[in-house]
Amino acid sequence: MSAYSPLSAQLDADTDVDVESTRTEGRRKMEWTLQHMPILQELRARFAETKPLAGETIGMAMHVEAKTANLVELLALGGAEVAITGCNPLSTHDDVSAALDSNENVTSYAKRGVDEEAYYDAIEAVVAHEPTITIDDGMDMVYAIHEDHPDLLDTIIGGAEETTTGVHRLRAMDEDDELQYPVFAVNDTPMKRLFDNVHGTGESALATIAMTTNLSYAGKNVVVAGYGYCGKGVAQKAAGQNANVIVTEVEPRRALEAHMEGYEVMPMNEAATRGDVFVTTTGNRDVITQEDFEVMSDGAILANAGHFDVEINLEELSELAIDTYEARDGVQAYELADGRRLNVLAEGRLVNLAAPIALGHPAEVMDQSFGIQAVCVRELIENKSSYDAGVHNVPDELDREVAEIKLEAEGVDIDSLTQTQSEYLDSWSHGT
């Protein structure tokens, strides 16, 4: 077992922390969010009765906050032993992590504000539990297992990946024939991407930016880098708050889609001369660079809602700056030689999770995403022989199962196909 300690042990060693009150506050947050997560509530009832995950060990690298914690406890209720750490050094809520670590079937290593060495030590600590299932947000755990612990690959049933960046990494790994066990691309299934990516990212990113800066969007030029599902959500929600939205893209069809939906579309360096607020949503690196910083207006706000802290090139910005200082909690100002100040939120990390005031996506949308995660884990265990190594789409029947639970919870009834309609749709012989 790794020498890296679970959070409870770390807090016990800190005489300035009241561990019990910290756990109580974390539990209070978890209970509040669970009230607004009817899918997880229903799955808790099912998993508690059938114990579909009995005997399995689940290793997780996720954003450890209240909504994620309810997924963790659902998996534990289903019979699994769960070890978890963070997938971002700044996104963990320590009170929630402490509450999780008090569950006898859960070990949490997640702690906010760790350095790079401790971040990867915590991942190693989770891997030391020898998981049979992995759940990732960004693919760091899958990578660590393949790179440093290939001896575990034969005993891993499969995994699930939460986010766009992680799925991109997994597909690249799969194309190189390096991925050695099946992983569900949870990010790509409709019940995740149409809600979590659009409404979750759009609402939480803009809300966090507004609360962190205490500024309005009305009348401002908001530049959205990337027009995938996350970028669409940010653009849509910003326009709804009376911002003028400018989109930058590298993919011609997405650029055309943004144009046809009424947004201005232009290269980043042109948008840089006009933007008041910049939000990156690409999952790629060097989206905003030195040539863009050089033409931005004084007071520009820069935030990342994509994934890793490489979308805004902070190394180049630091080289341009003659001074840097904390302008406000969660806001780092970079003063340039000509007196302009460019303001970076949350150190360029995921603003909706890493900013000091951040709470992540709304509970209702994460309920759907985490419902998919839970049924994917169940599917891997129940039908393990059906999946070869590689990236797999979430089976449609699982996506529909979660949608049906949500509709029932919302009190929404829908029609069903008649037998005649089903036969018509399945037939190829009907013409005009």
UniProtKB/Swiss-Prot annotation:
Q: Where in the cell is it found?
A: Cytoplasm
Q: Which reaction does it catalyse?
A: S-adenosyl-L-homocysteine + H2O = L-homocysteine + adenosine
Name the cofactor(s) required for activity, per the record.
NAD(+)
| Family annotation (PROSITE patterns) | ADOHCYASE_1, ADOHCYASE_2
User: Which example biological process does GO assign this protein?
Assistant: L-homocysteine biosynthetic process
Concerning InterPro entries, the annotation shows:
Adenosylhomocyst_ase-like_sf, Adenosylhomocysteinase-like, Ado_hCys_hydrolase_NAD-bd, NAD(P)-bd_dom_sf, S-Ado-L-homoCys_hydrolase_CS
Positions bound to NAD(+): 163-165, 197, 226-231, 249, 284, 305-307, 352
Give me the Gene Ontology terms describing cellular component. Answer: cytosol
Primary location = cytoplasm
Function field: May play a key role in the regulation of the intracellular concentration of adenosylhomocysteine.
Give the protein family. Answer: Belongs to the adenosylhomocysteinase family.
PANTHER family (alphabetical): ADENOSYLHOMOCYSTEINASE (PTHR23420:SF0)
What is the protein name stated in its UniProt record? Adenosylhomocysteinase
Q: What organism is this sequence from?
A: Haloquadratum walsbyi (strain DSM 16854 / JCM 12705 / C23)
Gene transcribed to yield this protein: ahcY
